[in-house]
Amino acid sequence: MAVVVAAWARHAIWWQVYPLGFLGAEPESAPVSAPRPRLRTLAAWIDYLVELGANGLALGPVFSSGTHGYDTVDHFTIDPRLGTEEDLDTLIAACHDRGVRVSLDGVFNHVGRGFPAFVEVVEQGPASPRAAWFHLDIDQPGPDGFGYRQFEGHPGLVELNHDNPEVADHVARVMSYWCDRGVDAWRLDAAYAVAPTFWKAVLPRVRERHPDVWVFGEMIHGDYAGYVRESGLDAVTQYEVWKAIWSSLNDRNLFELAHALGRHADLLATFLPLTFVGNHDTTRLASQLTDPRHVAPALAVLFTVPGVPTVYYGDERGMRGVKEERAGGDDAIRPAYPSDPAGLDAPAPIYDLHRQLIGVRRRNAWINDATVAEPDVVRNEVIAYRVTDASHTLAVVLNTGDETAELRLPTADGRVAAGDGTAAAGGDGGLDVTVAAHSYLIVT
């Protein structure tokens, strides 16, 4: 059975921002007595995201932390490098005035070493009243006199004990507190590392007061649909389609994309995934693709498959950046932006392409009630797939080859909605289409 979510979320298109980078914050936390009112300045970008075609602002970490935002020290206060709680209130109000929803990044799998409960454990030892909030190893020697479970081997990221009811109480309070202040949605960082039963206990308490909140979890590998069913989340991130898009285009092996779209179609019976071609953890699309001509086909997939699309800031302008596995290796993909849109260079064609494809998506709002049919054509360099419901069809053709592709689609008629090619009714009821080399075609 499909997860039932708020109607607004089914038609959301997010513009994702990593605030500490976007707003040019210091690499490490600032004194609490000197908050920098940066968050409220994001209001200058609301018109920009609306003009792009988005209706949601997805914020990366904003809570008090030591460094990059994922080492939280206080879930109830805004990082002084970004401002105060009132600054976030101002931003949320400005977004809501324009019909824009706001999502926060909830880091609840782990905390920073400066998190008060962990500081107590360091100071008082395993006898601390909140020692059970963590996975401690009192027999393991170390600078603290004991060992503790670290997230993915990072000493600065202390894993929480999700079997402890007090941890569930804390997370439910945090989520409810910020929803009370107007937050519409949550991204759950590293959800894949948390047992789904934890969220099954937490989320009903949040939804009791906020039934329309939309909650999606970060999942990379694993059983996406199973996790959604067992956890009560509304959605998870669709990394399978993300990887298949750029990998199949680079390799000119569109069988990989066909396989991923088939798995994606299976997920739609359970939930509507969060789709993307880039985020704060990945090499940017413009750098990931080996042929810049394939940016357009990649975006065509993003905005035509059922899902909740997200555009990572800068991708709409063709920004480049490579993620590196080292300290500071995310800096290139999380850069500062100007204080307002007037500071940007003139829009590149990719910006207009985003707007055009988002326009196609908006004019075909039925897509999120549809499914992806088995591709009509799959070759190494060409794929043709249809998105269909009971009364609509949208056909998409990608051509990564060096020559114009000619093929017949099993649909009676249609007009070109976007792309570089032609469509004409064939003699036997099919549709004859041509698609230029290294391009795409969308027919509705």
Residue ranges and their predicted role:
Residues 410-422:
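Solvent-exposed beta-hairpin/edge-strand motifs
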Residues 92-98, 119-123, 173-176, 189-269, ...:
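Active-site-proximal helices and loops of the catalytic beta/alpha 8
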Residues 54, 183-184, 233-234, 307-308:
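A structural motif
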Residues 427-444:
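C-terminal beta-strand-rich structural cap/linker in extracellular carbohydrate-active enzymes
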Residues 154, 419, 436-440:
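Tight coil/turn sites that cap or link beta-strands
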Residues 7-10, 25, 29-34, 258-262, ...:
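Loop/helix patches that line or flank the sugar-binding groove of alpha-linked glycan CAZymes
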Residues 3-14, 18-55, 62-181, 199-202, ...:
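Substrate-binding/active-site clefts of carbohydrate-active enzymes
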Residues 13-16, 57-59, 102-104, 186, ...:
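Hydrophobic faces of well-ordered beta-strands that scaffold small-molecule active sites
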